[in-house]
Amino acid sequence: MAYLVAVTACVSGVAHTYMAAERLEKLCLLEKWGVSIETQGALGTENRLADEDIRRADVALLITDIELAGAERFEHCRYVQCSIYAFLREPQRVMSAVRKVLSAPQQTHLILE
């Protein structure tokens, strides 16, 4: 079973941050992937990812419209990065990218436009 860590963050830090986190949880359940999700919203950082979780993750998914607080934590990881809009509009495209990156070398970074 694959294990993902993710961060969601939008400009206002209200609805879309949490909508993306909720949708990702459901998609990972369908894929039978474990997932831990950190949200960076109006209330600050919630469910902050532990360094150990990031280290053991197969892939990090950075769903953001803003500069993430602590983005350097993911430099050594395979990751897929996309906007909140792209994820909410085309979640299957993003999940397909995650599947591809799962088998890529460490430190593979895929940024979706």
UniProtKB/Swiss-Prot annotation:
Keywords: Cytoplasm, Kinase, Phosphoprotein, Phosphotransferase system, Sugar transport, Transferase, Transport. GO terms for molecular function: kinase activity; protein-N(PI)-phosphohistidine-fructose phosphotransferase system transporter activity; protein-phosphocysteine-D-fructose-phosphotransferase system transporter activity. It catalyses: D-fructose(out) + N(pros)-phospho-L-histidyl-[protein] = D-fructose 1-phosphate(in) + L-histidyl-[protein]. The active site is at residue 10. SUPFAM superfamilies: PTS system IIB component-like. Its EC number is 2.7.1.202. Residues 1-100 form the PTS EIIB type-2 domain. InterPro entries: Bacterial_PTS_Sugar_Transport, PTS_EIIB-like_sf, PTS_EIIB_2, PTS_EIIB_2/3, PTS_IIB_fruc. One of its GO terms (cellular component) is cytoplasm. It holds the Pfam family PTS_IIB. The modification Phosphocysteine is found at residue 10. The PTS EIIB type-2 domain is phosphorylated by phospho-EIIA on a cysteinyl residue. Then, it transfers the phosphoryl group to the sugar substrate concomitantly with the sugar uptake processed by the PTS EIIC type-2 domain. The phosphoenolpyruvate-dependent sugar phosphotransferase system (sugar PTS), a major carbohydrate active transport system, catalyzes the phosphorylation of incoming sugar substrates concomitantly with their translocation across the cell membrane. NCBIfam families: FRU, PRK10427.1. This is PTS system fructose-like EIIB component 3. It comes from Escherichia coli (strain K12).
